[in-house]
Amino acid sequence: MTSHTAPLNAAQVTKLRAVLEGQGFEFVAKEYTIFSAKKGKLNVSVYEKGPKVLIQGKDTEDFIRFTLEPEVTGEAKLGYEEIADPEHFSPHFGIDESGKGDFFGPLCIAGVYTDAEITRHLIKAGIMDSKRVTSAAAIRKLAAVIKATPGIAFDVIALRPEKYNELYATFKNLNRMLAWGHATVIDELARQKPDCPRALSDQFARADVLQTALKKKNICLKLDQRTKGESDTAVAAASILARERFIDWMDAATKKAGFTIPLGCSSQVVDAGKKLVAAHGSEVLGKFAKLHFKTTQQVTGELF
């Protein structure tokens, strides 16, 4: 979907303008419009006649789902009719992870079961991929909504750095370890919802890597992997729960260290690692960080 039109009332027009301003859209003059704005390759124009909004660009579908519906119209129906996208609303597990690319902190993997009723509820609540949510408070608020949804099933595992490093020494490959984690979560969800026929995850490796991990746990269901899997509501909900567990650990680690433990693998991360080692010795690093990262060598001069 690269174009969409929807009617708005006066209050929704005002609300949409405020939302666009908050998201950093650039407003431009355009004939016959109340206002017109653009950001990247997305254009949003509200026309006087109607009034109605015209959304154009490759991010049209995301804008409808993550901005227009939850923040402006309050109706989760635009472009998501169940007839047009039955798999989105059919019973399935969605799996996602958080912390994979961060030197500090755990690898958190979460799974969520959804069906048609649950999916409609989550869309209306504004559930979206955690990477689109900018604050920890918002992540926690959305996570609470997910957990309180009637009929939902979910599971989250957090591989704290000590356990992560132990497992990595065994697997010696991040994708195989991720597959084991995904399979572990799917196994628990299958215990809760044994009739669920399908699981969906973001594609992080060849399909056979995860299929092999599932076979080792005697799990038989249809597995789908795709890029941008988080566009699926179940996967998006899983991303929120995984992120919540990750930021909770990072907050606790910051308190324990006595200074901010940063995200990512930046120079600030290296500085924080050196500060930890200076205060507590190099052996403490394995309690805070993923030691196979090249960042370890930058911190200690050695690659574990």
Where does each model-flagged region fall?
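RNase H-like, Mg2+-dependent phosphodiesterase core
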Residues: 1-304
